[in-house]
Curated annotation (Swiss-Prot):
The active site is at 68 (proton acceptor). Its cofactor is Mg(2+). Keywords: Hydrolase, Magnesium, Metal-binding, Nucleotide metabolism, Nucleotide-binding. Belongs to the HAM1 NTPase family. GO terms for biological process: nucleotide metabolic process; purine nucleoside triphosphate catabolic process. Homodimer. This is dITP/XTP pyrophosphatase. Mg(2+) binds at residues 39, 68. Gene3D superfamilies: 3.90.950.10. It comes from Thioalkalivibrio sulfidiphilus (strain HL-EbGR7).
């Protein structure tokens, strides 16, 4: 089955392709079709994921999977949340976002730097699908005091997994996929799709 992935984020394309290996599902990035980015003007992860999936399905005529995800920091009342990709401004510069978040927490004790990655994933059979399949995953951790690790993307270098004392950028892609919010959401989504 071919499904368009509603993102221009190469890290997400790579991560989801790895997670879907062996399922019989082929992910085609929306960039292969020249699909413009959807305007993410929803007020929640669910709304933004649906907007992105509808946009990709409408432009390609294919079923679509979209996710909206972000990091929620308890000491910042859940921010950056849905604004995670553009926390430091438009353009989605991951290093700038990480610097801004570290600066916002520079006087916050390690024990108070709890955070979670949250992912909402949506599947639409077509652009007018009235019954989107929605799945959610979350990954608890804390914000490190500095960026560490060569892997991952986005906030991974500053998201620390307390039981490992490593950031998401310091663990293997396979370990990350096993633990991550996106991996959880995709596994739930696949279970729900098989039940349809």
């Amino acid at each position: 089955m071919k499904i368009v992935l509603a993102t221009g984020n190469a890290g997400k394309v790579r991560e989801l392709s790895e997670l879907l290996a062996g399922t019989g599902i082929t992910i085609l990035p929306q960039s292969d079709f020249g699909v413009p980015e959807a305007e993410e003007n929803g007020l929640s992860f669910v709304e933004n994921a649906i907007l992105k999936a509808r946009n990709a399905a409408a432009h390609t005529g294919l079923p679509a999977i979209a996710d909206d995800s972000g990091i929620e920091v308890d000491a910042l009342n859940g921010s950056p949340g849905i604004y995670s990709a553009r926390y430091a401004g438009p353009g989605g510069d991951a290093e700038a976002n990480n610097r801004k978040l570290l600066k916002a927490l520079e006087h916050v004790e390690s024990s108070q730097r709890t955070a979670r990655f949250r992912c909402v994933m949506v599947y639409l059979r077509h652009a007018d699908d009235p019954s989107p399949v929605i799945a959610e995953g979350s990954w608890e951790g804390r914000i490190a005091s500095e960026a560490r690790g060569p892997g991952g993307h986005g906030y991974d270098p500053i998201f620390e997994i307390p039981e490992l004392e490593l950031t998401a950028a310091e663990i293997s892609p396979a370990e990350k996929n096993r633990r991550s919010h996106r991996g959880q959401a995709l596994r739930i989504l696949l279970e729900r799709l098989q039940g349809r």
